[in-house]
Amino acid sequence: MMDFDFTMLQQIGYIASAVLFIYGLKMLSSESSAAKGNMVSSFGMLLAILVTLIDVINPLLMLSAILVGGSIGAVFALRVKMTSIPEMVALFNGFGGLSSYFLAWSEFNNQTEISLVMTLTYLTIFIGGITFSGSLSAFFKLSEVLKNTSNFVNSASRWMLIFGCSFALLCILQIVLNVSGLLILEMDLIRILFVCFLIASLITGLAFVLPIGGGDMPVVISLLNSLSGIAAALAGIIITNTALIVAGCLVGASGLVLTLIMAKSMNRTLYNIFFVGYAASGSSDAEIEGEIKPITAEDAFLVIEAARSVLIVPGYGMAVAQAQHVVKELGDLLENNDCEVSYGIHPVAGRMPGHMNVLLAEANVSYDNLLEPKDINPKMEIVDVAIVIGANDVVNPSATEQPGSPIYGMPILEVYKAKTVMVLKRSMSSGFAGVQNPLFFKENSRMLFGDAKESISKLVAEFKE
């Protein structure tokens, strides 16, 4: 009687899970099928886990670990507020990198002789370590535990980054030279260097993210997501796991594409975002002419009540105030008042890719009403009222009017072209780019100061009276 080939069954399972990953990713491209796509991808991962258990020596131990980890993840997912999703995404990226980091570490400890496979092990640990510590740094920045760092810390971080990358390159080079016989090192010495390498990869991740400002966090999170996928793919190669390779490649490629798209939407290079920042991009000392024109909630209501077309532009201020539900309520009231309502969404508004989309989706705002700059800017001059809720740099006219501005050339939502602009803001503070916003001083601009949720609630109350 022939023995059943469990290895073949395992490979078939991996191929099936890879197909589910790809199909699920395809479904995520449409708002109507995104939820189903998420479930399809989740089922693909469950299938990959189950077939992996086929040749595990102690499946009970693995199932226990899965149960504990899954329970913790479920609790986090159920308890997290929608406004804290960026922090959660950063943590998930970090734990993905940490998994690859530990897997490669374990594989190194199992190796008794020096081989070229060690180069993959080193690469996996380096990328996984950067992803983990960099994601932790991003998490604390998003949580506002870490504020903007000093020039000294930024300068020190750059040198630490250079040192970490150089040390990693030398460690990988010495493995290649050792295998080729050009530089023979004892295994004990290599293990000592390896411990230093473990620490250096974590320090490099911190040095990479610490100097980056909060305004660039969406791009940072996207890149860290890509790195977590690359680390997973490398880990899959090390342990010859097909599902891990496919999943890692999908995450790595999609994350990198998204990173490039977001950088383009800011009209900046990745080098400028990660190694220069806004401060070195130019000067914003030009004197702004005009004066601030405050408006009360009662007067603001009269303006928007008479409007036939309104554009709502959400920003990080809406997320902080958790105002997405009252924003949706205001939009519904305006539509009931025979007003055309749309939402202007800038790709880098908020603190993560799609931050505003997530918040508005939670409030059940129709995806069809969400417009990007290229879609709404040509029609901006016929918009009666543009309501800017906690957005700053993404509506700053300096990007188009001041060649010396740090954000000059960045595509923005050109709300200053609307007939009336109503800006909801706590204070006159600048955005993360540190650039004063001439929009606030425009003749057609009115400032409604205060908490965004409270201000919009007052407008809603006026409509209901």
Language-model features and meaning:
Residues T52-L63, V75-P86, Y101-S115, I175-L183:
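Transmembrane alpha-helix boundary signature
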Residues W105-E113, V176-D188, V219, S226-A247:
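Transmembrane helix-loop junctions at the membrane interface of multipass transporters and ion channels
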Residues Y14-L25, M45-T52, L67-F76, L103, ...:
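Hydrophobic core segments of alpha-helical transmembrane domains in multi-pass membrane transport
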Residues I288-E465:
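Structured cytosolic domains appended to multi-pass membrane proteins
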Residues L250-A307:
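Membrane-interfacial segments at transmembrane helix termini in multi-pass membrane proteins
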Residues L20-A35, G70-V89, S135-S150, T204-M217, ...:
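C-terminal ends of transmembrane helices
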Residues F4-A18, D55-S71, V117-F132, M187-A200:
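Structural signature of hydrophobic alpha-helical transmembrane segments
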Residues A35-G44, M62-A65, S84-G97, S150-L161, ...:
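Cytoplasmic-side transmembrane-helix entry/capping segments in multi-pass membrane proteins
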